[in-house]
Amino acid sequence: VLQKVAVFRAVEAIDANNWDDAEALLKEAKDIGIVPKYNALTLYWQAEVAYHKGDVERAKQCYEDYIRRAPKSEMEYHFAHYGLGYANLALNKMEDAQSAFNTFVREYTMRDSYLYDAHNRLGDAYFAVREFSDARKIYNIVAQASTDQRHYANYQLAKIDGIDNKPKAKIDRLKSIVSDNEGAYVDDAWYELGRTYISMEKYNDGAKTLQEFVDSDYLSPYYVSALSDLALAYYNLGRKDDARVCYEKVVDYDPESADAMEAVRGIREIYVSQGRVDDYFAYAERKGLQSDMSAVARDSLTFAAAKNVYLNGDMTAACQKLNNYLDSFVSGYNRTEALFYLSDCYVVLEKNAEALKTMRLLLDHGRSNYSDRVLDVYSRM
């Protein structure tokens, strides 16, 4: 009687989330250890407590010990396999998880959320070891169910469509999830749809999808990632100002995050590519980006902007940018390279006097990687 009372009081404690009390009562029941039925039940509930408290190895052992002792007619027998499947998933023992969940779904007779959750976890165990055909079969079962578990299964099927190189099927399934607007995986599907378009280089579709997503759900856990991907889509469409606005929103959302640091790099790259270095410095000053306000950073970014114009072949504009750099940074770290590019601009523009003067400045600056090439051109001119 005392053993039975201890077990039932432990179950009551578990129902009340008093896990420490439950653990103590189950130890008491185990120490009594007289009745085989309650010895087995003690193991089952010890497994439940251990799993809840994060001791997954002990939970696995207790579930297995219970299964060896318990009659198959007991409901706990079925749920021991269910719990064992979860324990094996947590321990990354996917074959053992498959075995446990397969037993549960084969022998459990109720058509309820536990059954379809177990199917989903079985699908996950196959998915984790890249057995996608088996995973698809399992998820398809759940996708036809009426319980909420169908939403996860449908989302996983979309991912498998992508893995199986069926982009149209993946996109159609994701769009269906988004348009139905049911369940807990609408955000996941919406964001994944945008990413899928971008991975296929369908930047217009990706930008449209992600813009609608970020406009609709500021609180989504995918909000910041979606903004970063949206910036990438806009950048590839040549809409650099729109891309910069997205990056700025990432910085504003959480300035100290790794995402913000990546966004700052994107903002810097856009300003430099547009030759708007002073605008970037103004932004960096407003945001307190001290590392980008140093003399070295200003030198580097100002030169990078001028170099981009040169590499794009606009020699007239490059002359102006390079001269501005040389005037602003008399002892600049990139002075030699700037003089070389400037002299080449003048040669292309057939401004020979300016070219000779610039080459002379470069040669007088001392030995460099450009000395031999410049000396050859200088002597021939």
Regions found by a protein language model. Give the residues of each.
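Acidic, polar-rich low-complexity tracts and alpha-helical solenoid repeat scaffolds
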Residues: 1-381
